[in-house]
């Protein structure tokens, strides 16, 4: 699958690592072309034979991609949604953001909405927004596991076909996709993302922990 990742920070790196492991064609875009080129070179060095492309322009790269992952903080994601609105027409768009305040101890959204729903309202009606990866940490994505267990990736969205595409990407990267329901479930996912972040200092796990849904045998 042709996937564009916008944002080359730690989460962009982690998600790209998993998608490359799944054999997908990954293109990177960042406001800093040097940052995108550096990450592409590092990813190619880590996985011999891998070709990671670097996009010169975001809009053209969006049009050529099957899935667009917005691997940016909430404010940056809002800006991207505004700037690339037309290009994102009919695209599967993945929002990974947690709408954190400046001190990282609360959400800036009200309980009656979510970052994902806000972003969805900014996109064309044909765009299919999926919430995913906001409850996973970058280091665990690079490692591909937590405590020798595959990562659970919780997914929310209103379009089953779009969620299926994202689930295929997750599964191909050696992780477990869990469909939690409609996009409004992003409200709970973002609260869970916040809780995971605030627990890191208390537990001393250094952002290398993860949420795991333990299933009964035979499920």
Positions of PLM-derived features:
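Active-site-lining helix/loop region of Rossmann-like oxidoreductase modules
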Residues: 151-219
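NAD(P)+-binding Rossmann beta1-loop-alpha1 motif at the extreme N-terminus of oxidoreductases
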Residues: 1-42
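Rossmann-like NAD(P)-binding element
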Residues: 46-92, 96-103
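Rossmann-fold NAD(P)-binding glycine/threonine-rich loop
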Residues: 97-139, 143-145
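General beta-strand structural signal in soluble alpha/beta enzymes
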Residues: 54, 128-132, 178-180
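Rossmann-fold NAD(P)-dependent oxidoreductase module
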Residues: 14, 18, 122, 169
């Amino acid at each position: 699958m042709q996937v564009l990742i916008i944002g080359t920070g730690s989460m962009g790196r982690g998600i790209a690592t998993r998608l490359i492991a799944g054999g997908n064609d990954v293109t990177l875009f960042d406001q800093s072309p040097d940052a995108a080129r550096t990450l592409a070179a590092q990813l190619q060095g880590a996985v011999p034979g891998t070709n990671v492309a670097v996009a010169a322009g975001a809009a053209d790269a969006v049009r050529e991609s099957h899935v667009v992952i917005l691997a940016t903080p909430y404010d940056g994601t809002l800006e991207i949604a505004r700037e690339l609105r037309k290009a994102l027409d009919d695209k599967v768009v993945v929002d990974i953001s947690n709408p954190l305040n400046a001190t990282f101890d609360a959400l800036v959204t009200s309980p009656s909405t979510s970052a994902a729903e806000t972003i969805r309202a900014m996109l064309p009606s044909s765009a299919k927004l999926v919430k995913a990866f906001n409850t996973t940490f970058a280091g665990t994505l690079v490692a591909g596991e937590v405590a020798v267990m595959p990562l659970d990736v919780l997914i929310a969205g209103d379009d089953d076909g779009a969620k299926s595409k994202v689930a295929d990407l997750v599964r191909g990267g050696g992780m477990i996709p869990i469909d939690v329901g409609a996009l409004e479930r992003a409200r709970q996912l973002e609260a869970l993302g916040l809780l995971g972040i605030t627990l890191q200092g208390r537990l001393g796990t250094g952002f290398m922990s993860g949420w795991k849904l333990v299933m009964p045998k035979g499920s």
